Amino acid sequence: MRTPAVSIIVPCHNGGRFLDGLVASVAAQTFRDFETIIVDDGSTDPATLEKLDALDPEIRVVHQENRYLPGARNRGFREARAAFVIPVDCDDRLEPSFLAETIEVLREAPPEVGFVFTHGRLTGALEGVMSRHFNPFDQLFLNQLPYGMLLRKSAWQSVGGYDETMRDGMEDWEFSIRLLRAGLRGIEIPKPLLIYNVSAEGMLMGHAARMHGTLWRHIRERHREIYRLAALLKIWRGSAPGKISLLEAAGLLGLAKLLPETWFNKLFYEALNRARRRRAERGDYRPDGGLRRNSNSAD
């Protein structure tokens, strides 16, 4: 069996209503040497199961019991035959040049570059362009990276995959910190080539957003060594100036120790909302990442 250059892996749990858009965007890719793997993560919705059964035979569908998003992504990576892998959700879409542009960069990059990512175009409850950047120091406090990035499969293997205990979200954030700790870095393509559907119940605005502080605390506990002062100073000195100052980082770490979890989580969530409102005020579809709420959304 021929080995493709890229594997596109798609976790799907009762998300059949979104698959037509994703499949159409995959079929429109200008780079053609890829395979598509959909991981049915214990779907129970009859319409989703019917949709999966009716897909083109060239799309490989693997079934498993519900292991949530990190477990489904790990299954997709294990099934992937290519050296380069992109995980996307079933309600996402890719611009036609996504694979062509990202694989060209990653193929030519040195081995320490483990991933390539693009900016995102948001649709649904939020609309606009979300800029994405990789600053190692900021990444310890803010989830800057999209989950939909082209990775070397060897990078996923080297850090042990996604943490399957993180069932409430932000597993991609914790995964990116392990990539950072492994000495891997990413390259940004400053174009919105990933189309990300935002729902009021989704990760960006829903449960995971409300638990942002709690999930960050989990990440910090898992990676205590990198959040110690000496390690933080080393990463801060090696990073370009970013969104988080050293003083702000120290303040967050101090508050996380002093405040009860519910208080800290509320503070963290409100800070994120203020930042989001500031971005929304900057306008719609702007290169600097302006966002606006879609009044026609179900939100």
Per-segment meaning from a language model:
Residues 97-129:
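Conserved donor NDP-sugar-binding/catalytic core segment of glycosyltransferases
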Residues 1-25:
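N-proximal low-complexity "stem/linker" segments adjacent to membrane-targeting elements
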Residues 4-7, 35, 174:
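Cell-envelope/extracellular polymer assembly enzymes that use nucleotide-activated donors
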Residues 85:
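Short aromatic/hydrophobic "clamp" motif used to bind/position activated sugar donors
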Residues 64-80:
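Glycine-rich, basic loop-to-helix element that forms the pyrophosphate-binding segment
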Residues 130-139, 167-168, 184, 188-221:
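Nucleotide-sugar-dependent glycosyltransferase catalytic core
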Residues 168-175:
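Acidic donor-binding loop at a coil-to-helix junction in glycosyltransferase catalytic cores
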Residues 23-63:
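Acidic donor-binding segment of Leloir-type glycosyltransferases
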